[in-house]
């Protein structure tokens, strides 16, 4: 009996590779995201991934873009709901902190900076900039750009050092999120959630 392998389209193959790379990033850190490891994870050859991404740097750049899309989509949805009073403003903070922490964005960013591959961060930075511009439309009275700057930097710092720093200060590991939530409510006037009826 022979096994028939379903042939993936180039886009499906790229998507599978990016999801595998993201899973490796979350499971084992950025050093585990290699063309060889991703290829093994999805049952493709190293040469196949070279064809799709050109190099390990190309894979990292695409992974950054992929993570950036997920991050900005989730944050944008959370902000819209919070502005309408349909979600706790904490959701905006949680999605931002999770993107850099649990989703591996902070480790990926730090690794790229340390390895000299800063250009690979451009897709994330561009997507965040576009999101902030959209969120700022009609809200000229709110410091959306400044709020985004401190929130992203707080989330990035928390992803890299937050738990250890909180422990050293005898604070709960979630303290940075609590502080960020208070600052977010104060700085942009997001509504507290309405009680559900």
Regions found by a protein language model. Give the residues of each.
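Amphipathic alpha-helical segments used for helix-helix packing
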Residues: 94-129, 163-165
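Amphipathic alpha-helical interaction segments
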Residues: 16, 91, 108-111, 146-153
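Hydrophobic alpha-helical connector segments
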Residues: 62, 73-106, 138-141, 148
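Helix-turn-helix
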Residues: 16, 20, 24-58, 62
């Amino acid at each position: 009996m022979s096994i028939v392998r379903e042939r993936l389209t180039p886009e499906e193959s790229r998507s599978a590779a990016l999801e595998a790379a993201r899973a490796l990033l979350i499971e084992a850190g950025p050093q585990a995201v290699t063309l060889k490891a991703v290829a093994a994870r999805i049952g493709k050859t190293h040469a196949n991934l070279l064809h799709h991404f050109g190099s390990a740097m190309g894979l990292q750049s695409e992974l950054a873009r992929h993570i950036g899309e997920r991050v900005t989509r989730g944050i944008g949805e959370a902000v819209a709901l919070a502005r309408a009073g349909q979600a706790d403003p904490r959701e905006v903070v949680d999605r931002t902190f999770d993107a850099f922490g649990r989703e591996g964005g902070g480790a990926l960013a730090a690794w790229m900076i340390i390895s000299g591959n800063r250009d690979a961060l451009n897709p994330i930075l561009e997507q965040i900039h576009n999101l902030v511009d959209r969120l700022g439309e009609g809200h000229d009275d709110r410091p959306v750009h400044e709020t985004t700057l401190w929130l992203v930097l707080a989330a990035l710092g928390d992803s890299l050092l937050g738990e250890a720093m909180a422990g050293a200060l005898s604070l709960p590991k979630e303290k940075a999120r609590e502080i960020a939530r208070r600052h977010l409510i104060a700085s942009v006037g997001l509504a507290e959630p309405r009680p559900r009826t």
